[in-house]
Amino acid sequence: MISIWGQIQNILEKSLNPGLFKVWISPLAAEVQDDVLRLVAPNEFVAAWVRDRLLDDIVQAATTVLGSAPTVVVDAAPQGAGSLSPRMGRAGASASAAVPGANAADGTQPVPAVQISSAVQAVAARSASGVGARAAHVAQPSQLGLPLDMPAPNRALNWRFSFDSFVVGPNNELAFAASRGICRETLSADTLFLSSGPGLGKTHLMQAVGRALCEASNRAAPRVEYLTAEEFATRLIAALKAREVDRFKARYRDVDVLLLEDVHFLQGKERMQDEVLATVKALKSRGSRVVLSSSFAARDLKNLDTQLVSRFCSGFLAHIDKPGFETRRRILCEKARLHQVMLPDNVTDLLADRIRTDVRQIESCLHNLVLKAKLLNRQISMEMAWEVLGHYAQQEVVMDFEGIVRKVCEGFGISPKQLNSRSRKREYVVARNSVFYLARKHTDLSLKEIGDRFSRRHSTVLKGITSIEREMSRETPLGRQVTNTLSLIERNGRITYP
């Protein structure tokens, strides 16, 4: 009988380029416990490559096999480990000291982990240099694979944003100043809490802080850890299962700056909250700085431990509002400059006037406009801008709650009765969460008032909104479906323009 990991590998083997599968998926060992899929790579080089480039493909394949999206953890095998767990591997693989990848059915023998480690690095090096030779003989390695410990966090991160590319306006100037202040240690508080709706610049500022600190020119540059609350929880689960909690604690409590995004994800997860609270306390006691972000103001995080909320509120609180017309216009000009195009003034004004929801939509609209002009080899014009705008929610949509419910039911093909039911059927849950998300975005209803309409608790609404935001941020079939459906509802469901 093919193991769960074997089934997942079969799907990946069909969907991925053969070279990608052979080099990066075959060497992985696997263990499935509850809703966690733990993958072990021969070394950190392979583990990091898989995390950065193939994690979404693995999650998608695992979801197909398991029926629900698991938490996927990719770790490197400890240095000098003679074998991997007997429970790990592909169907037919030996329970001895081997990494899966050899198929017992074809008569080949499993290859020891350290040998695969050497082979993988050799194949990757040849691929990068343009040499297409196939891996034939696995040479005896001259040294063991990299240890589990990652290098200094600063060097392991890839910062996409900087303070220089952040467009400052009345809506975000306080958050911008506070973020720069915590880098320069001119902010009187050692904790900064950033909050805003999705797509308004939290991630940009968080990464700008990390980048500014890591680019310090002296050798005393601070140690920085940057991750989301979901990643923190995933790594904690992996540490608990591997009985390496002390190692986990040492890693996150021994940094100079912790950047933790999307802390609203922690709601309802008591074990995770306890660890975050202990980590924040430890960091503050050693004089470290902590920067947190959330899609909700700290006061709205009512399903968190009161001590944790108190810690969040004890620092400097900075909220980012939606950008005004002039700020949106300057954002368009800055992004056009990065695209190396000259945007006509009338087109700039049109886009700035019509897209008011968030910065991410502004950037996406401009990107599609520039791409369309390049593909058609035409100049950007008002006519082309209007065509591209048809795919976006123009101006801030004004809908009432009943209208949102009606449009969501139409969009997801379900009835209001099914929407209000207690069923945990996937399409009903996604539709309900979509109503929560749109109601918070387009009405003045509080989270409690939204929950009351469905006879649900405040925490259920908060969790639903977080779930939708997480799906929309992922490049998965479900994420794309949710994004497209909600965009269509917003475009067709507007009543008036403000």
Swiss-Prot record:
Name of the gene encoding the protein in the UniProt record: dnaA
UniProt free text on domains: Domain I is involved in oligomerization and binding regulators, domain II is flexibile and of varying length in different bacteria, domain III forms the AAA+ region, while domain IV binds dsDNA.
Organism listed in the record: Nitratidesulfovibrio vulgaris (strain DSM 19637 / Miyazaki F)
Region described as Domain I, interacts with DnaA modulators: 1-69
CDD domains: AAA (cd00009), Bac_DnaA_C (cd06571)
Family designation: Belongs to the DnaA family.
A Gene Ontology cellular-component term: cytoplasm
Region of interest called Domain II, as start-end residue ranges on this chain: 69-155
Descriptive protein name: Chromosomal replication initiator protein DnaA
